Amino acid sequence: MKSHTQSLLAESLNALKQQGIVPADFEARIQVDRTKDKSHGDFATNLAMMLTKAAGKNPREIAQLLIDNLPESAHVEKVEIAGPGFINFFIDDNALANQLMVALNSDHLGLELPTPQTVVVDYSSPNLAKEMHVGHLRSTIIGDSVVRALEFMGHKVIRQNHVGDWGTQFGMLLAYMEELRAANGEQAKMELSDLENFYRAAKVRFDESAEFATRARKLVVELQSGDEYCNKLWREFNDISLSHCHELYERLGVSLTRADVRGESAYNSDLAQVVADLDAQGLLSESNGAKVVFQDEFKNKEGEPLPVIIQKADGGYLYATSDLAAMRYRSNVLNADRALYFVDLRQALHFQQVFKLAKTAKFVREEMSFEHMGFGTMNGEDGRPFKTRSGGVVKLIDLLKEADTRALDLVRSKNPDMDEAELAEIARVVGIASVKYADLSKNRASDYIFSFEQMLSFEGNTAPYLLYAYTRVAGIFKRAQDVDLSDATIILEHEKEKDLGTKLAQFGEVMTRMVGKGQPHALCGYLFELAGAFSSFYEACPVLAAETEESKKSRLLLSQLTAKTLKQGLNLLGLETLERM
C-alpha cells in the first residue's frame, strides 16, 4: 500500500508539471510514512511543503492541487489535508482485506520483490587457531539474519567468511608445534584439541624467547613462500579451527558453510599486485620506511593526514592490503552490486579509508556499493565489555551452554510434568533463541547490556514472549481442525480486526528497511508489535465463539496469517519456532 500511495503521488506531481504549476525539471523524493495516529489516516506525506518554493504557492493550496490530480484508486477511501499542508491517506478496508488474502496465499506474504541484486555479505570472520568468543556473536548472527532477509527478498547472496587464517599467529603455532613434535613425535597433534591452550602456550614462548620469536617470523615467511611442510601444518590448524567454528554455527542455526570461507590467505598472491598498482598510479608515499597512501579527506585531530598503511617497512602486508584485494575480487570476479561488511563500529575509519581508496584507484566498479554495517559492543551488567568473573574473555560455547542450562530450568518450572526429552528440546530452542534475539532486537549501532534474566523473561520484547505468542496462535488451529476455510475470506469490521490487519500489512515495509539498512531490530520490533496487536484482537474478538460463521472463518484467517507472519519473521532472524511450550 505504501508503494501504491507513492505511485499515486508521483502521477499527481507529473500532472502538475504538465500544467506548468511545478517546473518540469523539479526533482522531488516522494516520502510517504505510516501515521502514528489512525485518526490521521494510514499514510501521510509532506510533498506539498516540499513544492512550496518551486510552485510559488502556500502548502495547503498545493496539497489541494495534488489531491485534485490524484488518479482514481480503489485502495484509497479518502484523502485529507492536515495542519500546514500534510496530505493524509485513508486506506479502504476492503482493499486492505484483499491485500491480506493475497499475503495469506503467497510464499512471500504478498511482498512486491525488488529487482534482484548480487550482494556479498562479509560476516562472522573470526581469527583462526583460537576459539570463538562472545565478541564474534554480533557479526555472526546480525550478518546471518540480513543474509536470510536478502534471500527472502529475491537477491542472490554470496556469503564471505573472511577468516583470519594468515599472519604472525601461525608462525607462533608452527614454531611451537615443531618443539612439541621434536619432544613427543606425531602424538603432539593431539594437543590441538584444545586450541586456546595451544595458542596461549605458543604466545608465552613468543613473548619470552627472542630465539623462538625469530623462528616464528621465519616460519611465516616460509609459509607465505609455499613451503610444503609449513603449509601442511597450517592446513591442520585451519581444519581443526574451522571445525570448531562450524560446530558453533550449527548450534546457533547460522547458515555459513565451509564453502563460504574465503580467508585472508586467499588473497596472499594478489597483495604484491595491489602495491604495484597503487604505485603505478602515483598514489603511494613513503613514511618511516612503510608504503602508505594519504587521502585529503582523512586527518587526525591536529589536522595532519592519516595514512592507509599498505606495506610495512619489513615488507609485511596489513589488513588494508588484503581488504583492497578482497574488494577487487568481489567487484570484478563476483560482480556484486553491493558488499556489506558486518564488522565492529571501531573499524569505521578503516573502512571509510579503504572504500574511498578502492574507488580512487579504480580497483572496483564505480556503481558498486560498499557498506560498513558497524555494530556496538556486548557488555556485562556493569556496562563494560562482557567478561568472565576472573576478567577473561567469555568463550561463545560457554555462553551457549549457560543459556541452555538456564532455559531448561525455566521451561521445567513452567512444565514440571513434561517428558525430559521434550523439555530438553524446548530448552535448546528457547536458549539459543533468547541469546540471539537479545542481540538482534537492539539497534546494531548501539552497545547493549547482556542479561540472562532479561533475555529469558516471558514479558517484554524477548524471544520467550514471541515463541509463546506463536504457540498461542498456532494452538487456535488445533481446536479448529474441522472448520472448512476453503471458501472463507477476510472481513475487517471490528476496530481490533482493522488494527491487526494494518499491522500485518506493514511486513513488506519492515523487510525493505531490514535489507536496505541491515537492521534486524526493525523486524524484531515489528514482530513484538504484531504479537501485541494479535493479543488485543484475541481479547476483543472471539474467534471460535464468534457470533457468525462468516466472522469465525474471517478471524481464523487473520489468525492464520498472523501465525504465518510470526513464523516467517522469526525464521528470518534465524530462530526456530515451537508448537508447544
Swiss-Prot record:
EC number: 6.1.1.19
GO cellular component, as recorded: cytoplasm
GO biological process, one term: arginyl-tRNA aminoacylation
Main subcellular location of this protein, as a coarse class: cytoplasm
Pfam families, per the entry: Arg_tRNA_synt_N (PF03485), DALR_1 (PF05746), tRNA-synt_1d (PF00750)
Chain ranges for the short sequence motif 'HIGH' region as given in the UniProt record: 126-136
SMART domains in UniProt: Arg_tRNA_synt_N, DALR_1
Record's keyword annotation contains Cytoplasm: yes
Cellular compartment(s): Cytoplasm
GO molecular function: arginine-tRNA ligase activity; ATP binding
The keyword Transcription regulation appears for this protein: no
Keyword terms, alphabetized: Aminoacyl-tRNA synthetase, ATP-binding, Cytoplasm, Ligase, Nucleotide-binding, Protein biosynthesis
Record NCBIfam families: argS
Oligomeric form and interacting partners: Monomer.
PANTHER family found in the cross-reference section: ARGININE--TRNA LIGASE, CYTOPLASMIC, ARGINYL-TRNA SYNTHETASE
Protein name in the entry: Arginine--tRNA ligase
Origin species: Shewanella halifaxensis (strain HAW-EB4)
